[in-house]
Amino acid sequence: MKTSPIMANNNLHITAMITTALLLLGLSGCATFRPSVPVSNEPQYVAHTSLVNRPRLALVLSGGSLRGFAHIGVIKVLEANGIRPDLIIGSSAGAIVGALYASGMTARELELAAERMDMSLASDVAMPSLGIPWLRGELGLVRGEKLQQFVNTEVKHRAIENFPIRFGAVATNLHSGKPITFNVGNAGLAARASSSVPGLFTPPLIRNHRYVDGQLTSPVPVAAARALGAQIVIAVDVIYPSSHAEMTTPFSVMLQAFAIGAQHIKETELRQADIVIRPEIEPVGQLVFADRAGLIRLGEQATINQLPQLRQVIADR
């Protein structure tokens, strides 16, 4: 049976939308997804109350879509210079890199993990809801379950509280509009929630609430690190500058609105950091699958440039 030109065009359009969603995140996995997470292991926030065991040094990793690969370069230089954080907080793309690093991966292992990140989320496509009661659908084009499984596989299916480095993934509560830091529970689900761009990815349901991308309310979550007791905060900012947007599709317009909101919140958050590392990334579009190795090198160079100041801040505390 031949496919009509109209059907072919529709298929191409759907494929393009799916590809756009995948390119935005740039992360996926190939393992079979195990859909259920026991309620007892769903991510949640547990406040830090001890003054004795406060984290001294926190590494805060921003959102930034594919630009998040630059976070790995930052980690490479910190590791090479013996600078190890006690706490890692990530938002969106930063939550994914942060989860893997906090689980005990070395910088080299992170580079290898980056090479395993592909676009096989195409098999994770969802039928979006049309608002018709009898026709059930998802609240996004991609479920994000493959991403969840990818992260859980990489961290060896350990819960966040069992990581060697304390970790928190910041997501946005879709009901209250407030950020939450998931610092215990299922790591893959926490990273998925933190990375669920609204409209593209289905907001996961966690403890009866829907959660979307942390970049909406806390693009560089310095406040979350301070709330968990961090004394020194290194913040890494790889967020796409809103001034560099190329608005050629409905998705790019949505991303531009997303970026504008993040810029205003970001500047407030960064004022609370002790050191800010900003890799000089060329203004390529968010939907271009960028060169991983090149982004990692840019993260390295930006961190090398900040090393003298960083060492001084640590010595002074």
State where each predicted segment sits.
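Gly/Ala-rich beta-loop-alpha elbow adjacent to hydrolase catalytic centers
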Residues: 90, 94
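Bacterial N-terminal signal peptides
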Residues: 16-28
